[in-house]
Amino acid sequence: MEFLRRRIETQVLSLTGLALGGIDYENPPGDPGLFGPASVCWRVHGDFTSMLVGGISALLLQALHPLALAGVWDHSNFRADLLGRLRRTGQFISATTFGSRADAERLIERVRAIHLQVTGHAPDGRPYAASDPDLLTWVHVAEVSSFLKSHLRYLGPTLPDHAQDRYYAEVALIAERLGARDVPRSRAQVDDYLERIRPQLRCDERSREILRILRAAPAPSALAKPFGMLMLHAGVELLPDWASELFGLPLTAQRRQLIRTGVRCTAPLLRWAVRNGSVHRAHRRMGLPPR
């Protein structure tokens, strides 16, 4: 049984930012980082399964914004190294949530510097810049709204409304530090923002290519392949209805229930197996009992 547990954990951690190294989540002792263990974002960001589903859904949602997608398309090797991009994104989220304050601030400054180099023109001729405050807000909202929605669906459905609002207020700090402006800080503000930005979104050939790349992404092992496909289906199923319609991905109620049941049956096994994720290491840094 211990062999199985370690095997599963190794497979899981190979998909995360921990595989990149460079962040010591267990030091310095007692450093709460930017948020600390009493924060809501420690609860929401601490579960691998719900974060993976939310991350896939966020990636698809972000791909509906032509300018945001153009920056990734022109300045990233995601088509050849999707796993690498997911790891780097995961590292940033984990380090800014669970890392020491010094590591979190270092990564924020690194990403800000990278964003300054990402400029160009979308296929329709419009200029874009990754440092554009409005684009940064879009990427942030697409991401954190997907994380929270996945958490509510697959881990913490009873998270109180006030805690959900607090989550948005907490993570707004990261977006603002990156240069975003007018960042929504509550459920009502997020809902209003998504409604206002919808006229700017569309599904084009590049958007559909993102979906094709996700579907064709190689699994790190034969053991992980069925799990990866389930997570992809769950990420698609998590999309807002209007986003699913843009992608042309209607799902029947029966199909939705099948996907959700699959995730809920799989998640407990992963939670049992993983004992050394970033959240576990951060708990050790803070001298807290194991999760």
Tell where the protein language model's regions lie, with residue ranges:
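Mature, function-bearing regions of proteins
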Residues: 1-138, 142-291
